């Protein structure tokens, strides 16, 4: 597939740009976040839907950073978006476009609207605008600009006042947004006032910039949150005023929390990087996010390849999806059990090094891989795997948690003293020999295996939860395992 480069496209709004549109054959989607310091989980789903739709059609998925807020658009904030998308496995097909760098192009489009009579200069003062608002409130009307400079002679412009440029929105009729999710959404034009295109300081506004960028990037389908529906009506008018083809729209209901309210910080983690640090796998997040508002029959589990094959806009629901943390956790557990042990070990080490300051070596990695079948069987996150393997890093004598200490009563410590002598007599420290010895010891003591295994686990891990105890003993090695048992024996 050919690569896309915005800089190769002509900057004008004339024949060159129209040629781009007529040559366009490929489905092209985009994700256009504003840097906030993290990739919001709702934005991650939007990016995923755009990515899946482009991949389904053999098209292109592009990335645009809407960085016009220079204070918030710091390098770390922008990097957080890149890192979040990369972690999720959502690759883009061209160099990212930075909206702020295209301000001159946006101003060029405003001038074309002025030349076409589709925009005008407005010299209304802040005091006049405030009086408009107060009057509308007093009369119980929506607050709209009243168009006082719409048809006024520019010669009447007050001296020394820098105007804004407003769009000449149609006064009558309606604007219809034909949406793949919401159907036809109708907006009476009288409710869409003459929005500002260019501020008095010469900077372009959001709706103008988005239209110009989407046109120049040859975007064919705009998939985004339904909080942009009104923007879609305004943007459609700007497209038509410039003589450009309007892209197809799909406005997706926002994600809600378990309580039905819009997803917010009080519901828990919001950024993609937070889920990474909580120990979720990217393939689990992709599977979960695509099912938030989209469905394929009763299928819950499917690969990324299946999602690409099945994804379509018509199967996106019109009602907000609720984020279910327990469901995500269970889904993540499934993907952990399916994952390669070496990969899980490497990702767990990276995660716990980042979160807990782990210091590990190749020997630890080998032990972690050996224990992984038992560790991942019940784990729902990589953090749980890390906690389950932490006993490998501690030094003697172990600090036991409260539950482990309760198990290590005088009777249990005496039992361990008798067991350790039996284990010391073993020549081969291999799993099968260890298991045979411990089981035989339990029978001789007339005890169920659990009555021996529980204090043994507490002694060698400092916890009541661990991978299978025989795996633990074999992985620790003879000297370390016997030393830990002796430390707790009576």
UniProtKB/Swiss-Prot annotation:
An example Gene Ontology CC term for this record: cytosol
Chain ranges for the short sequence motif 'KMSKS' region as given in the UniProt record: 262-266
Subcellular location: Cytoplasm
Residues at which ATP binds: 265
InterPro entries: aa-tRNA-synth_I_cd-bd (IPR045462), aa-tRNA-synth_I_codon-bd_sub2 (IPR020751), aa-tRNA-synth_I_CS (IPR001412), aa_tRNA-synth_I_cd-bd_sf (IPR008925), Glu-tRNA-ligase_bac/mito (IPR004527), Glu/Gln-tRNA-synth (IPR000924), Glu/Gln-tRNA-synth_Ib_cat-dom (IPR020058), GluQ/Sye (IPR049940)
Biological process per Gene Ontology, one example term: glutamyl-tRNA aminoacylation
Catalysed reaction equations from the record: tRNA(Glu) + L-glutamate + ATP = L-glutamyl-tRNA(Glu) + AMP + diphosphate
Enzyme class: ligase
Assembly with partners or alone: Monomer.
PANTHER family to which the protein is assigned, alphabetical: GLUTAMATE--TRNA LIGASE, GLUTAMATE--TRNA LIGASE, MITOCHONDRIAL-RELATED
Stated name of the protein: Glutamate--tRNA ligase 2
Origin species: Parvibaculum lavamentivorans (strain DS-1 / DSM 13023 / NCIMB 13966)
